[in-house]
């Protein structure tokens, strides 16, 4: 899962949206630096990442990547799941329009920015102002996201080419998304994530 899915599942679970978004920027035990609700959100994010990586649908999808891009498949797939969530938001969350949800999420996350790592603050500067969460529905933007990550982290250069794997297996990936994401939503609503 990437930003949008983590925020969405956190909302369904009444968890800290701030903690769920911040988690990738926090190493080790967060309890000494953040309030309990944010810490719980960080741990929820970590549980979701571990669970998602082990879902049969996700393990199967990783095998569709070419040898040269398979190493970065988990990262690429996380971005792709956000694409499908953004694209199908009106079906997935008909009572909470995407624009309204994004405004709500932004307001929640903004409360922790003064005490956040600089890299997280920098991400937030772009995430909201450049409307990444809305733009995830556009495959050209997904390609830009993957290229941007490859540019920032040269050891992940294969992300650039992984877009072709997404394109080649688009329909099958979308089908897998519909297999597992509604289950995760139900688990979040039951606070079982």
Curated annotation (Swiss-Prot):
It is an enzyme of class 3 (hydrolase). InterPro entries: ACP_PD, ACP_phosphodiesterase_gpbac. GO terms for biological process: fatty acid biosynthetic process. Converts holo-ACP to apo-ACP by hydrolytic cleavage of the phosphopantetheine prosthetic group from ACP. It comes from Salmonella arizonae (strain ATCC BAA-731 / CDC346-86 / RSK2980). The keyword Cell membrane does not apply. Belongs to the AcpH family. It catalyses: holo-[ACP] + H2O = apo-[ACP] + (R)-4'-phosphopantetheine + H(+). Its EC number is 3.1.4.14. One of its GO terms (molecular function) is [acyl-carrier-protein] phosphodiesterase activity. Keywords: Fatty acid biosynthesis, Fatty acid metabolism, Hydrolase, Lipid biosynthesis, Lipid metabolism. This is Acyl carrier protein phosphodiesterase. The gene is acpH.
């Amino acid at each position: 899962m990437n930003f949008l899915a983590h925020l969405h599942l956190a909302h369904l679970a009444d968890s800290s949206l701030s903690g769920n978004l911040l988690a990738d920027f926090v190493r080790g035990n967060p309890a000494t630096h953040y309030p309990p609700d944010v810490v719980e959100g960080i741990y929820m994010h970590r549980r979701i990442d571990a669970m998602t990586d082990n879902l049969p649908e996700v393990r199967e999808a990783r095998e569709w990547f070419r040898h040269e891009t398979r190493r970065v498949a988990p990262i690429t797939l996380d971005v792709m799941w956000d694409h499908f969530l953004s694209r199908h938001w009106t079906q997935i969350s008909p009572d909470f329009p995407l624009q309204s949800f994004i405004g709500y999420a932004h307001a929640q996350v903004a409360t922790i920015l003064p005490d956040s790592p600089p890299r997280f603050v920098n991400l937030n500067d772009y995430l909201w102002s450049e409307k990444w969460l809305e733009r995830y529905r556009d495959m050209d933007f997904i390609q830009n996201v993957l290229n941007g990550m490859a540019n920032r982290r040269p050891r992940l250069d294969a992300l650039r080419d992984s877009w072709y794997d997404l394109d080649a297996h688009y329909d099958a990936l979308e089908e897998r998304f519909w297999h597992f994401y509604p289950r995760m939503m139900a688990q979040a609503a039951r606070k079982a994530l």
